[in-house]
């Protein structure tokens, strides 16, 4: 339980930093720092190795580079959970998987229904299928004991399923024209990882070199470079070699870096939306409507309805000490797309300003409303199970007291 509390607090702190970074980006874009902010995002830098060079603006170094590290971290979590964690038990994973599927299918269908006639707009169908776990966890912590621990654990498991879906979506649906040579080089990179595992190498530097080579190969291949992070993570050894567990060590070292640096930086460079008349007038564009409907209705009710049906058909059970009203509130928290939706938006529309930033504005509006509604439902859920753990503890104490009284009576 202490480990869970630490993780939740860690995630919540990251959520606060993302909020601050988002507010700073909005201030920079809409006040006297507009020119500086836009110039900063487009400053080019790169890596030159002989005749080969990679030159990119800062915003793309963040979206293609730092986010690859983020997905690498996600991959480490997924690998550990699948092999020895909560996802290794079919019984425990059933409800998050079913809820996660609903949280992807329903919002995607809603978005496509609104944007069916526009081929370019349809590229954004996945924007509403992801969640920002840091924000959601932050809301849960604000509610304290009103939300049972079992529901918090469910949210974290659902977040892992959500991340897996995001990886699959990016890998299969957001690839540009493929380069056979670069894909071949990526294959060599994977082969290097295999050799490192076969030889049981436990030096991080070798894996960093192999990962960098793999990232460059993916970058040039047409497959989004963040997938290189996921692929590399699957080759980080979980089994200790000479008493050293590389996966745990790397995951521990990256945790703070991801939470306190990468995600806030990502929010800062991507959330700078021009809050002008064009952005607000374009909120009636089908893309904006699809995003709002997907995050505010599709995501929450997708998670809730799929889970509700599974529970009613006894395929799985409701998290201990919770009820369906709380579960609906949790569903709304999954509608907080925020940074993850902004990420999918950036690769779906290739940072195009065709919608005058109304797409990004819709993400922020829908995320805020989903957070408020979810918080409100959970806050007012006042149910019999609200203090489940306290009641259970009290019952145990009373039972113990009764046993002591019985012993005393027998002595007398």
UniProtKB/Swiss-Prot annotation:
Task: Kindly report the protein's main subcellular placement as a broad class.
Answer: membrane
Please report the record's description of how this protein sits within the membrane.
Multi-pass membrane protein
Output the superkingdom of the source species.
Bacteria
> One MF term from GO for this chain?
sodium:proton antiporter activity
User: HAMAP family from the entry?
Assistant: NhaA (MF_01844)
Which InterPro entries would you find in this protein's record? Na/H_antiporter_dom_sf, NhaA
The reaction(s) catalysed by this protein are: Na(+)(in) + 2 H(+)(out) = Na(+)(out) + 2 H(+)(in)
The entry's protein name is Na(+)/H(+) antiporter NhaA 2
Give TM segment ranges: 14-34, 58-78, 93-113, 124-144, 153-173, 181-201, 204-224, 254-274, 291-311, 327-347, 355-375
PANTHER family referenced in this protein's UniProt entry, alphabetically: NA(+)_H(+) ANTIPORTER NHAA, SODIUM ION/PROTON ANTIPORTER NHAA-RELATED
Where does it live in the cell? Answer: Cell inner membrane
**Which keywords belong to this entry?**
Antiport, Cell inner membrane, Cell membrane, Ion transport, Membrane, Sodium, Sodium transport, Transmembrane, Transmembrane helix, Transport
Its job: Na(+)/H(+) antiporter that extrudes sodium in exchange for external protons.
Q: Which family does it belong to?
A: Belongs to the NhaA Na(+)/H(+) (TC 2.A.33) antiporter family.
The processes (GO biological process) annotated in the record are: regulation of pH
């Amino acid at each position: 339980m202490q480990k869970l509390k630490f993780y939740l607090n860690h995630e919540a702190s990251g959520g606060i930093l993302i909020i601050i970074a988002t507010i700073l980006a909005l201030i920079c874009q809409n006040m006297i720092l507009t020119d500086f902010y836009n110039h900063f995002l487009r400053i080019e830098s790169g890596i030159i190795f002989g005749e080969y060079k990679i030159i990119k603006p800062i915003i793309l170094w963040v979206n293609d580079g730092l986010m690859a590290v983020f997905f690498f971290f996600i991959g480490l979590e997924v690998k550990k959970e699948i092999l020895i964690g909560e996802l290794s038990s079919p019984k425990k994973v059933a409800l998050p998987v079913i809820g996660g599927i609903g949280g992807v299918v329903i919002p995607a269908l809603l978005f496509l229904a609104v944007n069916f006639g526009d081929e370019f707009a349809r590229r954004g169908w996945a924007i509403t299928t992801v969640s920002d776990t840091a924000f959601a966890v932050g809301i849960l912590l604000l509610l304290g004991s009103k939300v049972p621990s079992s529901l918090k654990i469910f949210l974290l498991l659902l977040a892992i399923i959500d991340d897996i879906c995001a990886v699959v979506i990016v890998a299969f649906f957001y690839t540009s024209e493929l380069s056979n040579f670069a894909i071949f080089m990526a294959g060599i990179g994977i082969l290097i990882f295999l050799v490192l595992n076969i030889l049981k190498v436990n030096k991080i530097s070798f894996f960093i070199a192999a990962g960098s080579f793999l990232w460059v190969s993916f970058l040039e291949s047409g497959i989004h470079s963040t997938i290189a992070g996921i692929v590399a993570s699957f080759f980080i050894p979980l089994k200790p070699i000479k008493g050293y567990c590389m996966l745990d060590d790397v995951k521990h070292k990256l945790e703070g870096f991801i939470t306190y640096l990468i995600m806030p930086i990502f929010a800062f460079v991507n959330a700078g939306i021009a809050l002008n008349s064009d952005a607000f007038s374009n909120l009636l564009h089908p893309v904006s409507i699809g995003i709002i409907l997907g995050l505010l209705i599709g995501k929450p009710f997708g998670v809730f309805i799929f889970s509700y049906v599974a529970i009613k058909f006894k395929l799985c059970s409701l998290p201990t000490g919770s009820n369906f009203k709380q579960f609906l509130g949790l569903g709304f928290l999954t509608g907080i797309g925020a940074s993850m939706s902004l990420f999918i938006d950036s690769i779906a529309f290739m940072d195009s300003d065709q919608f005058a930033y109304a797409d990004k504005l819709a993400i922020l509006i829908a995320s805020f409303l989903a957070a408020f509604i979810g918080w409100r439902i959970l806050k007012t859920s006042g149910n019999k199970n609200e203090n489940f753990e306290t009641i259970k503890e009290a019952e145990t104490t009373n039972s113990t007291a009764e046993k002591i009284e019985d012993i005393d009576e027998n002595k007398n």
